[in-house]
Design a protein with these regions (language model features):
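Alpha-helical cap/lid subdomain in secreted, periplasmic
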Residues: 34-39, 55-210
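Serine-esterase "nucleophile elbow" of acetyl-processing enzymes
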Residues: 1-70
Length: 210
């Protein structure tokens, strides 16, 4: 985490940029310019990041007043949320934080378009196969993810944020992250990144043509 922040300091965002903000799922996309056929997209994903982490590092983002920010965050918050010290991390807490991130960006950089992307589904069986364990949850993770997405959808439109439903495109017929798009039930493979890029590219084109 610290190394990545250090890297950001040495390679500032710059002006007239589009920022992809999130956790390892965003970071794992590497050079998004190639994927999105653009020259001004900056990857600000940090592996393991949570909504509170993003709230703490927004200064760097708003300083450069980007054209747009595409936010995808939340899975790490709830992944281990059944640990005793994680009591406060409820579906509502995570959803409110996501909206708070978008609100703060907008209040400090009013011309920035904020795109809130839905939390992606997970595939418990594939994760277990890959990692050999899966944390226990009183409420299944995919149910929590759907709840978070519902809340952010309802509030996003009221607050003038854009809402991008990625979730539907990535699920299989059992409502899990489709094995076609994932390496381990949580992270994306090349097919997953291609699909995501496909869903973003039209928005990137419009933003860059304005």
């Amino acid at each position: 985490y610290k190394k990545r922040i250090e890297n950001f300091k040495n390679n500032p965002i710059g002006y007239d940029k589009i920022v992809l903000l999130g956790n390892s799922i965003t970071e794992g996309g590497g050079d998004w310019n190639k994927k999105l056929n653009a020259e001004n997209v900056v990857n600000r994903g940090i592996s393991g990041d949570i909504t509170d982490g993003i709230l703490n590092r927004l200064e760097e983002i708003v300083y450069f007043r980007p054209i747009a920010v595409f936010l995808l965050i939340g899975i790490n918050d709830i992944f281990n949320s059944d640990k005793p010290e994680q009591d406060k991390v409820t579906v509502k807490y995570v959803a409110n934080n996501i909206i708070e991130i978008a609100d703060r960006i907008k209040s400090k950089s009013p011309k920035t378009q904020v795109y809130i992307q839905t939390v992606l589904p997970i595939n418990r069986e594939l994760f277990f196969e890959s990692a050999g364990y899966f944390p226990e949850h009183k409420i299944p993770l995919n149910i929590q993810i759907i709840e978070i997405n519902k809340i952010i959808k309802n509030i996003a439109s009221q607050r003038n944020h854009q809402f991008l439903n990625l979730h539907t495109a990535f699920i299989d017929d059992k409502g899990r992250l489709s094995s076609e798009y994932t390496t381990d039930g949580v992270h994306l493979n090349d097919n997953g990144y291609s699909l995501w890029a496909e869903l973003l590219i039209k928005h990137i084109r419009v933003l860059n043509n304005n």
